[in-house]
């Protein structure tokens, strides 16, 4: 810490966690708007906000997030979407993937990525005054990655509950190529969701967005298969 001139004192870490919590409160408030019958925000916009938050210090991005929140309060809701979708899968850094899905008339109203908003964006609750223990508990207890094999039911229930809460019509399961963890997890996940009457589209993607025409065709066919 001294070599990089970084303050790693308990006070400094606690301050950083407070800044995180302030930002998370804004993200959660904006995310709640996606539950509306006519959300004022697209999935692409929300994903852009999330990606910016992962690359920027929270005290720098917070003012812009608050301004965006105020802007959304004055917006009219999106009424012309064909289907409300939830995107599930590994870490997704490219908002263009969401934009591609929404270009077919869908609206992405929820996500469940390994490091996405549902498992990752929660306030940090202090544990016994030890900030290091608090951060460790937050990191390992919140992240719902398939590498935690015993957590399958928890991941499944999180998705099912979100489908109900956000009035989702169908789930898009995106798997980055060669990610064995999601590759293995996807088979029982697709089966379990379909058994519960939830339509699922499984898409395998490259790290970079490519074969857009094929992806658009599959998304369009998925929406039509739901009668939308």
List the model feature ranges, each with a label.
Residues 179-185:
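Glycine/threonine-rich flexible loop motifs
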Residues 89, 112-113, 174-177, 204-207:
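Active-site proximal loops enriched in glycine and acidic residues that flank catalytic Cys/His/Asp
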Residues 1-121:
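A charged, amphipathic alpha-helical module
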Residues 163-173:
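Proline-aspartate-enriched helix->loop->beta-strand connector
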Residues 89-159:
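Redox- and metal-dependent alpha/beta enzyme cores, enriched for Fe-S-associated oxidoreductases
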Residues 187-228:
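Peripheral docking tails and interdomain loops at the edges
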């Amino acid at each position: 810490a001294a070599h990089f001139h970084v303050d790693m004192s308990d006070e400094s870490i606690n301050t950083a966690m407070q800044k995180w919590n302030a930002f998370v409160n804004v993200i959660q408030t904006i995310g709640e708007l996606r539950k509306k019958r006519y959300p004022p925000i697209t999935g692409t916009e929300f994903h852009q906000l999330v990606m910016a938050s992962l690359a920027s210090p929270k005290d720098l991005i917070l003012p812009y997030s608050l301004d965006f929140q105020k802007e959304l309060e004055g917006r009219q809701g999106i009424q012309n979407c064909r289907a409300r979708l939830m995107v599930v899968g590994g870490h997704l850094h490219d908002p263009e993937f969401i934009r591609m899905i929404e270009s077919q008339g869908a609206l992405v109203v929820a996500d469940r990525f390994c490091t996405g908003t549902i498992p990752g964006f929660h306030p940090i609750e202090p544990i016994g005054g030890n900030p290091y223990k608090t951060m460790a508990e937050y990191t390992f207890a919140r992240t719902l990655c398939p590498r935690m094999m015993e957590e399958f039911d928890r991941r499944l229930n999180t998705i099912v509950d979100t489908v109900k809460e956000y009035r989702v019509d169908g789930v898009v399961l995106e798997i980055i190529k060669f990610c064995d963890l999601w590759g293995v997890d996807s088979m029982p996940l697709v089966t379990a969701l379909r058994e519960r009457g939830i339509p699922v589209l499984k898409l395998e993607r490259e790290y970079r967005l490519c074969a857009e025409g094929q992806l658009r065709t599959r998304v369009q066919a998925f929406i039509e298969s739901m009668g939308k």
